[in-house]
């Protein structure tokens, strides 16, 4: 339930608008609302972190509006809560009116949803399922530079799940479309909420099966096989892509050690 802040409330403050996040001094604000001049603002608690409430305020600040990416190097749990806040703020902003009848909607008091009193339609935040996979061939891992990535970062392959397909089918399809290779021994590893803008990354590892590597220029600038101890610039720590790469490196080292014995 939303409330108007008196200034005495305390916790972590997620102030967000249009997928931007208020980060004074590059950090997520913490402490009393009055210390950040937030009294009078409308807030809603969206979780807890380290025993303190996490509050969402849906508004634009005049300065220090940044990206939730800037919190990647903080604790994973806090990054996820910040991502939740940014996604919820954008959800409420984009669902002020019902898509069926055009009447104004209001936020539910019991769940993350927007309700229409006129036609009784109910809307929930959109979550886009994505698959991401690390592919190993002996002591090498397949890495690529995506056209949308900056700074020369090399990462593993990923893509959105299409309507009517399983996660496993999505992995195989994306790999074939982007690299022209087939994979085998696919296994699930972990997942990560990814608020750019509203994805849920489901991570896999797989082994090379067949096919000649040929990247899709519409998706990738280049792609190649890299030995596990000669890797290029990688995604930052805290990303599920980095986790997959590091797990693959561990496997390669273990196999090399076993072969050495």
UniProtKB/Swiss-Prot annotation:
Binding positions for Zn(2+) per the UniProt entry: 98, 101, 116, 119
Domain Nudix hydrolase: 125-248
Catalyzed reactions per annotation: a 5'-end NAD(+)-phospho-ribonucleoside in mRNA + H2O = a 5'-end phospho-adenosine-phospho-ribonucleoside in mRNA + beta-nicotinamide D-ribonucleotide + 2 H(+); NAD(+) + H2O = beta-nicotinamide D-ribonucleotide + AMP + 2 H(+); NADH + H2O = reduced beta-nicotinamide D-ribonucleotide + AMP + 2 H(+)
Gene: nudC
Similarity remark: Belongs to the Nudix hydrolase family. NudC subfamily.
Cofactor(s) named in the record: Mg(2+); Mn(2+); Zn(2+)
Functional note: mRNA decapping enzyme that specifically removes the nicotinamide adenine dinucleotide (NAD) cap from a subset of mRNAs by hydrolyzing the diphosphate linkage to produce nicotinamide mononucleotide (NMN) and 5' monophosphate mRNA. The NAD-cap is present at the 5'-end of some mRNAs and stabilizes RNA against 5'-processing. Has preference for mRNAs with a 5'-end purine. Catalyzes the hydrolysis of a broad range of dinucleotide pyrophosphates.
Record carries keyword Electron transport: no
EC number: 3.6.1.-, 3.6.1.22
HAMAP family: Nudix_NudC
Subunit: Homodimer.
Taxonomic lineage of the native organism: Bacteria, Pseudomonadati, Pseudomonadota, Gammaproteobacteria, Enterobacterales
Residues reported to bind substrate: 25, 69, 111, 124, 192-199, 241
Residue interval(s) of motif Nudix box: 159-180
Residues reported in the UniProt entry to bind a divalent metal cation 1: 158, 178, 219
Entry's cofactor comment: Divalent metal cations. Mg(2+) or Mn(2+). Binds 1 zinc ion per subunit.
Record keyword Manganese present: yes
Organism: Yersinia enterocolitica serotype O:8 / biotype 1B (strain NCTC 13174 / 8081)
MF annotations from Gene Ontology: magnesium ion binding; manganese ion binding; NAD+ diphosphatase activity; NADH pyrophosphatase activity; RNA NAD-cap (NMN-forming) hydrolase activity; zinc ion binding
Full protein name: NAD-capped RNA hydrolase NudC
Record: residues binding a divalent metal cation 3: 174, 178, 219
Residues at which a divalent metal cation 2 binds: 174
Cellular component GO terms held in the UniProt record: cytosol
GO biological process, any: NADH metabolic process
Keywords annotated in UniProt: Hydrolase, Magnesium, Manganese, Metal-binding, NAD, Zinc
């Amino acid at each position: 339930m939303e409330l108007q802040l008196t200034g005495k409330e305390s916790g972590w403050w997620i102030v967000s608008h249009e997928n931007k996040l208020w980060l004074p001094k590059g950090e997520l604000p913490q402490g009393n609302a009055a210390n950040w001049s937030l009294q009078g603002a409308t807030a809603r608690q969206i979780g807890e972190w380290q025993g303190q409430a996490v509050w969402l305020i849906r508004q634009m600040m005049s300065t220090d509006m940044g990206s939730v990416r800037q919190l990647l190097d903080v604790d994973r749990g806090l990054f996820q809560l910040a991502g939740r806040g940014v996604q919820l703020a954008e959800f409420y902003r984009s669902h002020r009116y019902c898509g069926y009848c055009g009447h104004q909607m209001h936020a539910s008091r019991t769940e993350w949803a927007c309700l229409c009193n006129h036609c009784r339609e109910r809307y929930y935040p959109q979550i886009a399922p994505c698959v991401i996979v690390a592919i190993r061939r002996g002591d090498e891992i397949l890495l690529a530079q995506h056209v949308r990535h900056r700074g020369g970062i090399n990462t593993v392959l990923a893509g959105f799940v299409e309507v009517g397909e399983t996660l496993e089918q999505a992995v195989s399809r994306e790999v074939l479309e982007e690299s022209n290779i087939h994979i085998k021994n696919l296994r699930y590893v972990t997942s990560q909420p990814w608020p750019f803008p509203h994805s849920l990354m489901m991570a896999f590892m797989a082994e090379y099966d067949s096919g000649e590597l040929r990247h899709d220029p519409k998706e990738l600038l280049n792609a190649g096989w890299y030995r596990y101890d000669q890797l290029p610039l990688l995604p930052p720590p805290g990303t599920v892509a980095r986790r997959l790469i590091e797990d693959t490196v561990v496997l390669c080292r273990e196999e090399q050690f076993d072969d050495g014995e």
